[in-house]
Amino acid sequence: MKVFNRPGYLHQHTMGMDVEGREHFVVVIKGSFDFPARSGAVAEASATHVPLVAADEATGEPGFSATRWETDFAFRKPMCDVVVQGAAYAPEGRRAERVQVGLRVGGWQKSFHVVGQREWRVMGPSVRATDPYPFERQEFGYDTAFGGVDRLNPDDPTPPAFMSNPHGLGFASFRNQAKLSGQPLPLTEEVGAPVTSPYEDYRPMALGPIWRGREDRLRYGGTYDQDWQDNVFPFLPSDFDERYYQQVGEDQQIAKPERSLDVVLLNLTPSGREAFRLPDPALPVRLFREWETACNEVIYPDTLIFDTEARQLSMTWRVDVPIKRSVTEFTECWIGRPRGGLIRAKEAGKSYMSLAASE
């Protein structure tokens, strides 16, 4: 397929399947933008765009650690995911035991506390936390949020786990209390809900992708029972919901932005507060089957990723079109507002030569 990519974003095509079993041609587009030096300015296109992520990338051993970056090749996303990976910085570089971090995009916002390293201490019949260790900079994510698997008893074949976040820290079962001293607490807490017990049900606080088995995501994944195996496989179950493709919880999903929005980062960079605007999120895309227009839309990003350590924002767009015969029927794709010569050549039924075109 020939691609005319005027903005120079990264792009790749793949295939997806809907619940009815219909195959779709999917184009995924990703552009990266640098945080501006001037407060309130618009983020500018990066010299080098962040590569598309082909498969989920974990912070450690896959399946036993949190997701750092989730694949860019989801089929569809009804909402826009807001994702942050980075670290907390103490205000003015002064070591602190607790720092509130936050992000605001348009009218949406989320904030929580990042806390210094602590340990559980068993004191007679009770369990207490040590004082937080002061920090200037501290990374955080779901592998340091509340949760985890209680492996204090090596002979337990089915150790208890905090299923909302089995990759986290701080959770334990009461039956292993005697071995709890020295075990780490989470590095993040919900504002107004400090972690004071390993046995309570706390909300894991982070800004990255959630694991695919989390209840509020898994419930959209569909039912894979014997009836599905006998009568539906290899297609999706009828109760599969495309909200499963959202890589963050509902508290980090926003409507797909159709205009530039204000962004504010709190204590996620050394400066303490960063304020800038999203670049124009509207992206015209046109797909062709030979001379037939298969799709002519203005699309909006369904994923915003803030890599605060790199001072970079990435936006991801996607569009899908049902396949009539085969994936090779799609012959041309225009990304961005096309040049006049390209439009005139298409209308005249002629080929258009451009150094910007790629196969």
Regions found by a protein language model. Name each.
Residues 2-359:
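Extended intrinsically disordered or low-complexity segments
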